[in-house]
Amino acid sequence: MRTPLLSLENLSIYLNGFKGDTKKLVSNININIHRGEFVALIGESGSGKSLSALSTVGLLPSAIKASGTGKWLNLNYDLAEHNSLKMFRGKEIGFIFQEPLVSLNPLHTIGKQIGECITTHAHIPNADLKHKVIALLKDVKLDDPERRFNHYPHQLSGGQRQRVMIAMALSNKPKLLIADEPTTALDVTIQKEILDLLHSLRASYDLSILFITHNLKIVKNLADRLYIMKEGEIIESGKTEDVFKKPSHAYTKDLIEPKIKIIKSRLNSPKILLSAENLSVKYKGPRSLFRSSSKDFCALNKVFLNIKLGETLGVVGESGSGKTSLALSILKLIDYQGDIKLHLPEPRLRKKERLKNYRRNVQIVFQDPFSSLSPRLSIRDIIGEGVISHRIFSKEQVEEKILLALSRVDLDKDTLERYPHEFSGGQRQRIAIARAIIMEPKLLILDEPTSSLDAAVQKQI
């Protein structure tokens, strides 16, 4: 019998509460990964899959503790001892995090950040270091790597940033690559490119891969074996082909073929709530000392739009097609040309107050809940910020509204004193939805709200 590259035995993970209580998040799971194998760990938001992966390299938050035994080839180690895991981190095990924009330092170029990953584990001259970084960028198929070397994270698209994260994870030629939801919030075209890239790198770098995802279907043709997690437990495992052909658990069946009930709008009003005419958005091209002007980019070109009261309108398009620009212009968060009108009675207000009243009636849930939620605010402050700013409710009424909004998105009141980084991606999106609906808007704009959610939670949303 082959010796696994990595084994996790009886892994349990606990959250230490504010009042000294302990909550079990992951319960006695066992995972084996062999050399050259592609293993997928699948589960819905909050199932414990990302925490399980973080525990392998000692990256759990301070309030969360792990117990159990890890085994790297023939070396046993205690999963509770964070210091014993440092020897694997970045060298033997590379890690791709879920949100590249958050993981990358906005103040340093990508060349410098990848270089730091290399020099942490090896001494290498600067000239050789640059060549090695550029070679890594070529390996991950980042276009024009010599130029991208000096770019900052904000100058790259979501897919490009994810390629940079992959390059960082591969920088010390690890034996195991852990990819935590690497295609979350990317459109289907870019998703396929990233998955194809990981497939090719698996062969060229002789990698084992632990791929964490909520989307069972995207690993159907990639993974050798699957582990299905639910509520902190592994409920099913096996070869990918066997699980897809004959799933034994009802939850797995629902992941493979989620049954989404289509609910028709109960409101069938002919009244137009919002109209947009000749709506155009242009972004200025880059300027420099040597070029006084450059071609502007047209994101929207003379768009006409009517949204009726009670109507659900879908806007479909791939990355870069202008969907988000349309949403931001309707919210009046960016400059636009054309006319946008909300057909509601307008109180007599000053211009600044009119805009505030407009945005009370038009709310948005952004695509990436991690970057749209302030890391410095508690969940109570995040959800209540909007209603507090309007100063039309008492302190007691605000508290009632916060609790009601929280219950509507199926989160309990214990979450109110916690912070965004303590939640899974799906839970953060629920918080973002609660922040929007607490305002009781007439129009709710959802910018790809389910792209980062698993099939079961997508169905719930």
Over which residues does each language-model region extend?
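ABC ATPase NBD Q-loop/coupling interface
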Residues: 69-87, 125, 196, 339-357, ...
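A short, proline-enriched helix->beta-strand linker immediately N-terminal to the Walker B motif
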Residues: 171-175, 438-442, 458
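Conserved ABC ATPase "signature" region
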Residues: 128-147, 397-414
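ABC ATPase NBD coupling module
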Residues: 77-94, 112, 120, 242-247, ...
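Conserved ABC ATPase signature
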Residues: 151-156, 160, 419-423, 427
